[in-house]
Amino acid sequence: MNGAAWQKAMPDVVRGMFEGKPFVPQCSKPCDLKQANIPAFPGAEGGGMYSFGGRGVNYLCAPVSSKVYVVTSLADSGPGTLREACEAGGPRVVVFNVAGEIKLKRPINIVAPYITIAGQTAPGDGIVITGETMLVDTHDVIIRYTRFRRGAMDVAHRDDACGGNGIGNIIYDHCSASWGLDEVMSMYRHVYARHNKKQDKLPTVNITIQDCIFAHGLDLYNHAFGASIGGHNSLFARNLFANNISRNPSIAMNGDFNFVNNVIFNWWNRSIDGGDNLSEYNIINNYFKPGPVTGFDQTKNVDKTIAAYRKALKKGRLYVYYTSETGSGKDGKAPSICYRILKPEHGRSKDNQNAWGKAYVSGNVVEYFDNVTRDNWDGGVQPADIGGKDRIASLLKSDKPFAYNKPQNVMSAAESYAYVLDNVGATIPRRDNVDATIIQGVRDGLPYYAKDAAVHVSPYSKRRLPDNSYKLGIITDPQQTGGLPIYNGTPRTDTDNDGMPDDWEKAHALNPADPTDATALTPSGYMNIELYINDLEYFKAGK
């Protein structure tokens, strides 16, 4: 936990504990954290569905004293900045009345619990966070419609685009993340450091990541990785993983792992893998679409490879391409990465290396591989060196899904593909060009790269793939896919600076000259500021 950030937030955290708003750093089980009796927002699902976020919790039944922070500055720090809001203490709701790039000079550390970040409230083209990462090292966090595009290329400081050591009651919704230098996203455990005692690494609990994009990790150090995620009481639903070499995602915690209705495109040598002998995997109705880098033999020429891929794509012969050209599994013995759904891992200690968890793997589509689509256990589950598919099934297969907090509407894999491409990521206030080109590349089966794309030259780069791998979708520099667009927007009129624009307040019978009404609780259980940030139609209309 970051010392400076903690010292800054601690007075409010301590005061909150005396007021019935606890900080629970020792949490290790889903039941250790109290949850709300209403959803974090309409449409919230899974383990993080009942996060308190910026509304806060009160065990003493006293009035909740939440605060609204309005981001009006794109600076790294100071009044009106995102850092000021995130690194404060106490329950808080963060809204935006500025559009553009927030370029961080150092990471933002969110250490105090009870925060909601509403990226959908930014005017115009919205906001994007670049330069450094935003670390969530606490509990009861809601983050929606926010773009994280770190983009820094100093390999001595290889951080993710977003993530952290989350404690629990966390939900990410409709976020877009790219250009990380380790993973694009990490969220699976936290560290409980007791005074003069060994640190405990504990699972993140009650976590949901839904409707998000994790794409284009920067491959400057063989680490263009998608995500390391996990936790207890988890749900990862309707997300897109695209153009990452590995960890799409990596299951970084034991226990339940519920991965439903996601789309995975253009991985190189790893799709989903991880877990251990205590894992219970639900891998349900996801859509896997190999791309030009999937199974790529790094000794081959990129230009010849992409030419062969384009030819096969045009003729509808990608099955033949993957079974004859990629160098992956073509000897008929080793299973191919091109149709891998899951590579489960065995026990983590020397004493249980022959022990495996259990997996319910069903309804997943692997494009171009009809046999694996018909029966996901016909090559789609690939643990290391334990025999053929019958042996694998006898050790790992569960015939029924494990109980979990499932989405209200579990779609088929084909329905997931259509839904995800139409809806995923920070689509409000509007989808930016970075996401648009990623999505179009998935549709086309051909990742986009800029006409003026050039090899990134760095004395610190260490890679297995060729320098021009951007032609296959694996980049080392954001400029290879067009770079960061300009985000424009005009601030809304908010006379009392309570985070709710005058026109919205008038339309909802509130007083635009009264700054206290934003945090007033309504009969719905939500504060007025929450009703505002959840009014997505208002933001879609460009108001």
Give residue spans per PLM region:
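Right-handed parallel beta-helix
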Residues: Y114, G119, H139-R150, G168-D182, ...
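Extracellular calcium-associated, cysteine-rich motifs in secreted modular proteins
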Residues: T476-K543
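N-terminal pre-domain segments of enzymes
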Residues: M1-V64
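Extracellular beta-strand/beta-solenoid scaffold signature
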Residues: I129-M134, V155-G164, W179-T204, L220-G231, ...
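Extracellular beta-strand-rich, repetitive "passenger/adhesive" scaffolds
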Residues: Q120-I127, T146, A513-D517
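Extracellular beta-strand-rich solenoid/capping regions of secreted or surface-exposed proteins
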Residues: R83-G90, I102-T116, I127-R144, R150-I167
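Acidic Gly/Asp/Thr-rich repetitive segments characteristic of extracellular carbohydrate-active
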Residues: P42-V94, D517
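Extracellular beta-rich repeat passengers
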Residues: M1-D12, G16-P22, M253, N258-D477
